[in-house]
Amino acid sequence: MNILITNDDGLTSNGIIAARNSVEDLGQTTLVAPLTQQSGVGHAITLMKPLRAIKTELSDKTYGYAVTGTPTDCVILAVKSIMDKKPDLIISGMNIGENLSRSITTSGTLGATFEAASFGIPAIAVSLQVNREDLKFRTGVNFIDYSHAESIVNKLAKKVIKHGMPEGVDILNLNIPANPDSDEIIQSNFADRMFSTDVEKRIDPYGHPYYWIVGDLIDDGIEGTDVHTLHILNQPAVTPISIDMDAQVNISKWLD
C-alpha cells in the first residue's frame, strides 16, 4: 500500500506530519507538499514556469519533498515522477482550519484531492478546526494536539483501504473538531457558505488603494450540513464528493 501525503500549508507544517502519523501503520508513505503556504489556491496548476522538488528534512528528522508550486502540482509530480509506484491512496492535510461548505472549491487542500481523483486515486481531504485564528496560514512548527485527529483519520483510511470508496464517490472531505465529543464520523451535506465574504479597502502611504478579501465565519444552523455537524454537534463531519460536474439536467427545450 503506497500512500501519498500532501497539503496546502506547506511541507514544514506539523499537520502533514500528523497526517503521515495517522496512516503510517497502513503502508509506505511519501510526503510531497508545497515549499510555501498555498492556502486558497484551489485546483491551480503551474504552467508558465518550471517546478523544483527539493528533498527536505522535516522537524521530526524524516524527509519529504518540497515543491515550488501548488498542491495540484505536488500530486502531479508525485504520481508522474517522484514516486516509483502510483499511490493507492492520497491524503491531503491535515489542514490547519476547517474546509467546509461549497467554499471548498477555493481550498488548496481540496484541490490536491481533485487532482488525485483525475488520476483515479482515492483521496481523503483532512482539515482540523482550530480555536485560535493566529494558528492559521502559518508555516512551520505549531503546538496543536493532533492525537485525536490522527485516530479518526486512521479509522476512515482503514475503511477506504478495506472496502474501497463508496460507489460514485471520488473524494472524502473530513473535518474534525478541535476537541470532538467522540470519534463518531457523521456524514454531512455541504452548507451553502462558510464565510460572509467582503472586501476591505485601504490606502497605502502613496495614496493608492489596495484591498483585502475578508470574511466572518457563518454558523449555519441547518441540521445535516457540515457546518452544523462541526460547529454545533462538535462531531467529525465527512462529505462524499464526486468530480462528475454534469448537472444531469436535460436543457434541450430551454435551448430551443
Swiss-Prot record:
<feature type="binding site">
    <location>
        <position position="8"/>
    </location>
    <ligand>
        <name>a divalent metal cation</name>
    </ligand>
</feature>
<protein>
    <recommendedName>
        <fullName>5'-nucleotidase SurE</fullName>
        <ecNumber>3.1.3.5</ecNumber>
    </recommendedName>
</protein>
<feature type="binding site">
    <location>
        <position position="9"/>
    </location>
    <ligand>
        <name>a divalent metal cation</name>
    </ligand>
</feature>
<feature type="binding site">
    <location>
        <position position="95"/>
    </location>
    <ligand>
        <name>a divalent metal cation</name>
    </ligand>
</feature>
<dbReference type="InterPro" id="IPR030048">
    <property type="entry name" value="SurE"/>
</dbReference>
<keyword id="KW-0378">Hydrolase</keyword>
<comment type="function">
    <text>Nucleotidase that shows phosphatase activity on nucleoside 5'-monophosphates.</text>
</comment>
<dbReference type="Pfam" id="PF01975">
    <property type="entry name" value="SurE"/>
</dbReference>
<dbReference type="InterPro" id="IPR036523">
    <property type="entry name" value="SurE-like_sf"/>
</dbReference>
<feature type="binding site">
    <location>
        <position position="39"/>
    </location>
    <ligand>
        <name>a divalent metal cation</name>
    </ligand>
</feature>
<keyword id="KW-0963">Cytoplasm</keyword>
<dbReference type="GO" id="GO:0005737">
    <property type="term" value="C:cytoplasm"/>
</dbReference>
<keyword id="KW-0479">Metal-binding</keyword>
<comment type="similarity">
    <text>Belongs to the SurE nucleotidase family.</text>
</comment>
<keyword id="KW-0547">Nucleotide-binding</keyword>
<dbReference type="GO" id="GO:0046872">
    <property type="term" value="F:metal ion binding"/>
</dbReference>
<dbReference type="InterPro" id="IPR002828">
    <property type="entry name" value="SurE-like_Pase/nucleotidase"/>
</dbReference>
<dbReference type="GO" id="GO:0000166">
    <property type="term" value="F:nucleotide binding"/>
</dbReference>
<dbReference type="GO" id="GO:0008253">
    <property type="term" value="F:5'-nucleotidase activity"/>
</dbReference>
